[in-house]
């Protein structure tokens, strides 16, 4: 059986495995120029409370970034949620990962391929509707665009591998044109880019969202960074060893004794003797 719905439609949680893995990759490749890891917060499937007058109203983005806030709440505690009026900061970036049946919630009138630059006034989600139970929370689009004014709102579909970017300009979201063959967008306010990268993450090879730097290089995860560091150390050690070998060979060929070569290069006599025998001893 595949993709069966929950028996409780109100049950919260991640809709699929991709919604767990993709946010991890976003957080683990994030490297900001002006904010260290202790001065930014990333949330995944976390309640984002946005209206102090209606303190229970919230949205739950798949992933969001807030900069210039402590990584830990009040500098010492993990967050259970993110309360905008308490933190004094709204997200700079929100990423939603499309799920079947949720397109209108995430994209509003942009669900269709056609972009409506001047939507009819009656489609604007800027009014809070009322019903018999009272005031209802506004649409997600209104919250991100009008209430929080999130500078960058990005939507990605794992089914089509399509990335869409909406940038907040003059009070409204404007969709940014991306190259379908190489979808990337540069977030100038944060000096970092986001694009669609095809590769392996957590043992799964597919298209993923991933951050890149000003030179266009994909930013590594912490694991990849450590692997690169270890490889660089290995190569540096091999280079030093090769230089020592060459220097020892040159000195021996010049007529110096093994003791003299060992003293000059700081090597053990046995190493120099081994070099005499093999010509390629690795130190």
Set out the residue ranges of the language-model regions:
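Charged, glycine-rich intrinsically disordered N-terminal tails and low-complexity linkers that flank
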Residues: 1-45
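C-terminal interaction segment
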Residues: 1-15, 32, 53-54, 72-93, ...
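Generic internal hydrophobic packing segments that stabilize the cores of diverse globular domains
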Residues: 23, 27, 60, 91-92, ...
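Short, His- and charge-rich active-site/binding loops that engage polyanionic ligands
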Residues: 37-39, 44-81, 85-86
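Short, basic interhelical loop/turn and adjoining N-cap
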Residues: 265-275
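Alpha-helical DNA-recognition elements
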Residues: 278
């Amino acid at each position: 059986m595949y993709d069966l719905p929950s028996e409780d439609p109100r049950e919260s949680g991640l809709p699929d495995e991709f919604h767990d893995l993709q946010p991890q990759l976003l957080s683990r490749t994030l490297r900001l120029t002006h904010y260290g890891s202790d001065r930014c917060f990333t949330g995944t499937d976390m309640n984002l409370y946005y209206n102090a007058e209606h303190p229970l109203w919230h949205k739950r983005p798949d992933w969001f970034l807030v900069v210039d806030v402590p990584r830990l709440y009040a500098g010492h505690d993990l967050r259970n949620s993110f309360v905008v009026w308490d933190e004094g900061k709204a997200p700079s970036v929100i990423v939603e990962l499309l799920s079947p049946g949720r397109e209108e919630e995430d994209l509003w009138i942009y669900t269709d391929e056609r972009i409506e630059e001047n939507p009819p006034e009656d489609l604007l989600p800027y009014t809070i509707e009322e019903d018999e139970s009272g005031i209802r929370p506004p649409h997600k689009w209104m919250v991100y665009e009008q209430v929080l004014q999130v500078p960058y709102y990005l939507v990605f579909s794992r089914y089509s591998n399509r990335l869409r970017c909406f940038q907040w300009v003059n009070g409204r979201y404007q969709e940014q044109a991306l190259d379908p063959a190489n979808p990337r967008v540069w977030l100038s306010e944060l000096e970092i880019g986001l694009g669609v990268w095809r590769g392996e993450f957590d043992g799964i090879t597919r298209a993923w969202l991933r951050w890149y730097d000003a030179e266009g290089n994909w930013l590594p995860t912490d694991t990849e960074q450590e692997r690169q560091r270890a490889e660089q150390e290995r190569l540096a050690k091999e280079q030093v060893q090769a230089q020592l070998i060459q220097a020892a060979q040159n000195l021996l060929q010049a007529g110096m004794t093994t003791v003299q070569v060992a003293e000059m290069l700081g090597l053990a006599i046995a190493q120099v003797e081994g070099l005499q025998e093999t010509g390629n001893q690795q130190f």
